[in-house]
């Protein structure tokens, strides 16, 4: 899981209280998926 800096956080504020837990970072899970999992996701989306 890759974390990168978010651009919606206001400097000088209490991140945990005002902007949600873990504010300041974007977690990108898409890079972790294997090819088989991607294919399965496509099948699930078409079945919905």
UniProtKB/Swiss-Prot annotation:
Positions of transmembrane segments: none
Induction description: Expressed only in the forespore compartment of sporulating cells. Expression is sigma G-dependent.
Source organism (scientific name): Bacillus subtilis (strain 168)
HAMAP family to which the protein is assigned, alphabetical: SspO (MF_00665)
Protein name: Small, acid-soluble spore protein O
UniProt cross-references to InterPro entries, sorted A to Z: SASP_SspO
Region (Disordered): 1-22
Chief location of this protein within or outside the cell: other
């Amino acid at each position: 899981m890759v974390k990168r800096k978010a651009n919606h956080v206001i400097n000088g504020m209490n991140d945990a209280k005002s902007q949600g837990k873990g504010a300041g970072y974007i977690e990108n899970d898409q890079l972790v998926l294997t090819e088989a999992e991607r294919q399965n996701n496509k099948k699930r989306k078409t079945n919905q």
